């Protein structure tokens, strides 16, 4: 069995503009630096159920708004990529976040998600998207939590 050493791995990371997803993106980029993998930052959007089928106003560009969010998150972590040497590709898709991430993770080495996104209850240890991905992903999943803040020793 021959092995092609030129094939780079791919790390998929969910990005939604939350602090947890920023931590996940930082972790994915750091891991890619160590392994030589590429990073695919995936963001998605949905029309809110409360919209009732009506658009907020004509030419409302949810995809464009989401693209700006993911691009800003990537820029804050890797800038233009020169300082890290990691190629980060961004993907924006309409759909349910867990399904979008699972589809993107096909063929990936790793799926990285934050422990909670924008819509999770603050008391939960793991959001519904992270839980769904952890139990259904076609590859290993890493769920990134924010660092624990310990009280100073007395």
What do these predicted regions represent?
Residues 43, 115-116, 145-146:
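Short secondary-structure boundary segments
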Residues 110-135, 150-154:
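Glycine-rich, Arg-bearing micro-motifs that act as flexible, cationic patches
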Residues 1-7, 20, 78-111, 148-154:
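Structural beta-alpha unit
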Residues 56-60, 108-109:
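Short, hinge-like loop/turn segments at secondary-structure boundaries
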Residues 58-69:
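A short acidic, glycine-rich active-site loop
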Residues 40-42, 89-93, 142:
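General small-molecule cofactor/ligand-binding pocket signal
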Residues 2-55:
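Small/aliphatic-rich secondary-structure junction motif
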Residues 35-38, 86, 139:
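Short glycine/serine/threonine/alanine-rich loop segments
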């Amino acid at each position: 069995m021959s092995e092609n050493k030129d094939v780079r791995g791919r790390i998929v990371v969910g990005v939604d503009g939350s602090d947890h997803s920023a931590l996940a993106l930082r972790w994915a980029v750091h891991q890619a630096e160590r392994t030589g993998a590429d990073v695919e930052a995936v963001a998605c959007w949905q029309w809110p159920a409360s919209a009732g089928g009506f658009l907020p106003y004509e030419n409302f560009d949810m995809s464009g708004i989401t693209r700006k969010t993911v691009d800003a998150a990537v820029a804050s972590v890797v800038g233009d990529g020169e300082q890290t040497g990691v190629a980060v590709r961004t993907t924006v898709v309409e759909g349910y976040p867990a399904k979008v991430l699972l589809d993107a993770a096909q063929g990936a080495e790793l799926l990285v998600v934050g422990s909670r996104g924008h819509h999770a209850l603050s008391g939960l240890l793991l959001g519904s998207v992270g839980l769904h991905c952890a139990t259904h992903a076609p590859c290993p999943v890493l769920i990134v939590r924010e660092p624990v803040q310990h009280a100073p020793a007395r």
